[in-house]
Structure formats: structure tokens, C-alpha cells
């Protein structure tokens, strides 16, 4: 597993997006925990998967405080801005292939239930969540959607493709859609193909009832690798947070961590 401690380079990218640390008021009182210290704890929880209440006092920030910052920054759109910033850096350095998009999903247990959960048909109906992931041709994560584990893959394709980000980093107008989209048999439907063609995207979706030798797996494998990278962030293996806003924050931060490691060529 890669380091559970936040690199200084990540803090440098994140710091301009953070709100300024508030000074102690005129009446005194306890100093507010610095944002970068809270960010270090959030990174640690994401990578190790520990519970908020198990955060050590020696880290300089309680788990409760870090949880509040995680939610507050998600509501302010900060995690989304971080993800876009890292995508821009990858695009600037020629590490994105936005001509191709690949879609796949993975199921995550959610023992405590919560928003966007449902019975997992592959796990005896236990409560779970489905993460639908969109990546570029190199496997860089572009978007994640969270639904109940029993949600149909067919119905997720339109929504996830509409979340294709407008990445800057190079001269010219940002690309609005990829040229081609790849998906497995779970997304096979004529309506999905018509929708993609309407957007100007060439669909490459494996058809149900056909042999597994279409050759599409030579391209689709990148999304399966990215799903494995996300599961390497232990907080993403099991969903413990019931609120949608917290899960969305984890999704965007996890994508940002993967993007950062690809950009700086760190172990993923």
C-alpha cells in the first residue's frame, strides 16, 4: 500500500483552494485546528480506513473535526475543484487520453445502510452501494456515481457520461465529450447506443449473448485497474458513512488521490 501520510506536493496543490485559517478572536479561546492539519487526518482516514473515533490525538486534529471539514468542503465544492485542478495538470503534461472513455461499476458493502444503498443481488441481498466509474483511455478517473447496489447498469450510462469533465490545461476549447465510449455487457441497450451517438460518441458496448472474444477487453481493462486502485484506498472498500454528501466527498477525494499519484508518478 502507498504511504498513508499526505505528501507535501499534494498539500501545495490543495492549499490555494482551502479557506484561510481563522485567527483567535479578541476574547481568546482555543486556536482553530489549521486546515492542512485537518486535511492530513482526512488523507490518513481515506488511505487506512480507520474509524473517525480512532484518530490519535497526536495527529493534531480530532476525527470529529476532520469529519466536519470533509463535509463542509464538499458542500463548498472544494473536492470537485481539487479533482479538476489535478485533471488539468495531467492534461497539461500529456497524461490524459480524453478521446476515449471507459465505464464500469463495482459493488461495495454498506453495513449501516444510508443514502443511495440497496440490496446487493450478488451478496445474498445484503445492503450495498454501486460505484459507477468513468475513466479516460489511460485509466485516469473522471467521474464516480453512487447508487444502490441493485441499480441497473444500463440506466447509469447516460448519467455518468453527462459528468464528463471539461478539462483545461492546454490551449483551445475543452473537450465536451470523448470520441468513443467502451462498456461491458451490463450496459448493452439500444437506447444507450442511440444516446451516445446523439452526443457524437461512437459506442463500443459488448452485446449480451455473444462470445467473449470481441477484443474490447484490450481497452476496458484500464477501468478495472482503476477500480482496484480505488479499493487500495481502504475507506473505499466498505461504506461506513450513511450520508450522500460524505460519500460524494470520499469519491472526489479518492479520484484526486489517484490523479495526484499518476501525475507525480508515485506508487498508486
Model feature map: region roles:
Residues 1-268:
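Short alpha-helical elements
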Amino acid at each position: 500500500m502507498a504511504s498513508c501520510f499526505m505528501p507535501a506536493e499534494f498539500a501545495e496543490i490543495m492549499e490555494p483552494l482551502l479557506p484561510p485559517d481563522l485567527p483567535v478572536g479578541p476574547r481568546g479561546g482555543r486556536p482553530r485546528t489549521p486546515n492542512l492539519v485537518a486535511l492530513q487526518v482526512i488523507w490518513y482516514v481515506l488511505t487506512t480506513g480507520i474509524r473517525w473515533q480512532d484518530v490519535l490525538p497526536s495527529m493534531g486534529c480530532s476525527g470529529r473535526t476532520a469529519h466536519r471539514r470533509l463535509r463542509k468542503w464538499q458542500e463548498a465544492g472544494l473536492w470537485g475543484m481539487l479533482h479538476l485542478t489535478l485533471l488539468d495538470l495531467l492534461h497539461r503534461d500529456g497524461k490524459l487520453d480524453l478521446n476515449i472513455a471507459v465505464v464500469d461499476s463495482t459493488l461495495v458493502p454498506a453495513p449501516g445502510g444510508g443514502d443511495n444503498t440497496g440490496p446487493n443481488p450478488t451478496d445474498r441481498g445484503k445492503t450495498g452501494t454501486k460505484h459507477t466509474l468513468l475513466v479516460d483511455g489511460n485509466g485516469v478517473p473522471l467521474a464516480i456515481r453512487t447508487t444502490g447496489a441493485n441499480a441497473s447498469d444500463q440506466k447509469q450510462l447516460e448519467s455518468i457520461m453527462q459528468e464528463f469533465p471539461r478539462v483545461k490545461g492546454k490551449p483551445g476549447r475543452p473537450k465536451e465529450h470523448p470520441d468513443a465510449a467502451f462498456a461491458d455487457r451490463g450496459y448493452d441497450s439500444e437506447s444507450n447506443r442511440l444516446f451516445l451517438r446523439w452526443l457524437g460518441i461512437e459506442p463500443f458496448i459488448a452485446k449480451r449473448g455473444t462470445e467473449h472474444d470481441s477484443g474490447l477487453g484490450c481497452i476496458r481493462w484500464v477501468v478495472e485497474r482503476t477500480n482496484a486502485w480505488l479499493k487500495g484506498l481502504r475507506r473505499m472498500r466498505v461504506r461506513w458513512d450513511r450520508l450522500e454528501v460524505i460519500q460524494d466527498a470520499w469519491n472526489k477525494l479518492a479520484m484526486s488521490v489517484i490523479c495526484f499519484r499518476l501525475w507525480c508518478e508515485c506508487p498508486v
